[in-house]
């Protein structure tokens, strides 16, 4: 089963209230709030305000999109993000794995990153949250081999993956990534880009249908960014997402 939602950083220039209203209006019942602008982990008043929006608009926070970067951010700061996530009403946090893809890491960099990941996973298990790594270029999880190695090494139910297409590789290669990482994937960031161009999701429905057919289990499908970054484009993108889910 798929649950439609929105990543708040799609609209960094808009307020949480406006984003929550738009999500509700266009049938996106779940929001991933970003920690950089909308929901800073140290601002408990703002976090509580956002939690109130969930009741007002009958939506939920499906995840906390942090910019905590394993291997770079002090592991001692992770607890503050976990506390913030719980205020927002979610037990899922998005993290980043380093600043290099696996093939570019030295043994020392790899060993340190994995050590920090093990510490983070232990903290997640203790606090009953799930840490999910962004599937992103210029991080350890850029390639399926790097991501799979990391998942297998850490081997924790509280340490998992997001997935999103890599616009630098082919749809077939993206499908291979999904197939390899499927047991570890939680949420999906949804957009339709090439390496140098953004397109509407409607233009990519067919390839996205293939991506979803390769996945098992339940997933939140979260729109991330608009083709033109305008909130006015949300109705069309939301319509395409809902169409994709209903296929």
Placement of each model-derived feature along the sequence:
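Distinct, well-ordered alpha-helical segments
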Residues: 15-20, 43-47, 51, 73-76, ...
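Active-site cleft segment of glycoside hydrolase catalytic domains centered on the general acid/base Glu
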Residues: 103-117
């Amino acid at each position: 089963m798929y649950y439609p939602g929105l990543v708040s950083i799609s609209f960094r220039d808009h307020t949480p209230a406006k984003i929550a209203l738009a999500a509700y209006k266009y049938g996106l019942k779940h929001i991933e709030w970003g920690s950089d602008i909308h929901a800073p982990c140290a601002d408990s008043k703002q976090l509580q305000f956002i939690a109130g929006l969930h009741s007002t608009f009958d939506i939920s926070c499906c995840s906390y999109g942090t910019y905590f970067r394993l291997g770079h951010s002090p592991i001692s700061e992770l607890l503050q993000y976990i506390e913030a996530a719980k205020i927002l009403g979610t037990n899922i946090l998005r993290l980043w794995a380093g600043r290099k893809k696996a093939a570019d890491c030295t043994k020392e960099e790899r060993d340190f990153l994995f050590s920090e990941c093990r510490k983070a996973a232990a903290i997640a298990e203790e606090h009953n949250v799930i840490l999910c790594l962004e599937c992103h270029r210029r991080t350890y999880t850029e390639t399926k081999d790097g991501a799979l190695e990391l998942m297998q090494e850490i081997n924790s139910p509280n340490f998992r993956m997001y997935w999103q297409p890599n616009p630098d590789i082919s749809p077939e290669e993206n499908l291979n990534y999904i197939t390899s990482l499927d047991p570890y994937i939680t949420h999906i960031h949804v957009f339709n880009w090439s390496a140098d161009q953004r397109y509407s999701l409607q233009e990519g429905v067919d390839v996205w249908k293939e991506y979803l057919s390769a996945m098992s289990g339940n997933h939140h499908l979260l729109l991330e960014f608009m083709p033109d970054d305008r909130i006015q484009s949300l109705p069309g993108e939301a319509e395409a997402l809902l169409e994709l889910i209903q296929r």
